[in-house]
Amino acid sequence: METTKKLSVLLCLFFTMNQAISESDSDEHMATFCNDSSGNFTRNTTYNTNLNTLLSTLSNQSSFANYYNLTTGLGSDTVHGMFLCIGDVNRTTCNACVKNATIEIAKNCTNHREAIIYYFSCMVRYSDKFFLSTLETKPNTYWSSDDPIPKSYDKFGQRLSDKMGEVIIRSSLLSSSFTPYYLMDTTTFDNLYDLESVVQCSPHLDPKNCTTCLKLALQELTQCCGDQLWAFIFTPKCLVSFDTSNSSSLPPLPPPSRSGSFSIRGNNKILVGMILAVSVFAFLGL
């Protein structure tokens, strides 16, 4: 009987920790930009009320779609806003990400008339200017692995450029798909490593501007991080990422306690798993 009670407690612990891991992975904050040049608004004004309404609506709508845009107010009190979740995340993850983003953008850009916030799974933006169909690549943010591509990955730079160029062209044909402009491709090279390529544009861009946005984002990403295991750039209108970190040819994972490294997204899962395993044996007295 005592053992059964202990197992029940451990199961509750496991599911709680697993939920925390999932939320942590999906809600990784990348950057927040509060645009000072657009001016400020005063609290308790009509613009402030319209902004609060817009952010609340975006948060609610993220339960039903991976993309949504909205305009509230009239004249100088008009606020335009949108959110975009990465095409492969589910609605639960999208909603959690957008909910956090709307809270944080309001908290960190308290009186700014324009701001944008990026997470790994989503972005949220608002402005007093209409921006939906405009091509923009700034402000952007990128993250990358701390570990370089192994020397055995022959001609990686050229292969990355060629493959991403192909994926960008294919994605421009997906303007009317269920998830517009989103495309993920996995290609194996030399039976040695897999290259996962992901691109996505804001649905309001036309195919030409989507292609241009992705090419400019790729150019910036390869210049900064083209020799890393993985890299990811998020711009106001598109995103580009590549990943080889799941390749079977890579050496064993480094110790999870290594701080300050983003080499492998998900190291925390390994650490939590180890802690949970130790807890099980200790709790049961094994």
UniProtKB/Swiss-Prot annotation:
Main location as per UniProt: membrane
GO cellular component assignments: membrane
Residues that span the membrane, as ranges: 266-284
Cytoplasmic side: 285-286
Protein topology in the membrane: Single-pass type I membrane protein
Extracellular compartment residues: 21-265
InterPro entries: GNK2 (IPR002902), GNK2_sf (IPR038408)
Gnk2-homologous domain mapped to chain residues: 29-131, 137-247
Protein origin, superkingdom: Eukaryota
Alphabetically ordered keywords of this record: Glycoprotein, Membrane, Repeat, Signal, Transmembrane, Transmembrane helix
Record's subcellular location: Membrane
The protein's name: Cysteine-rich repeat secretory protein 57
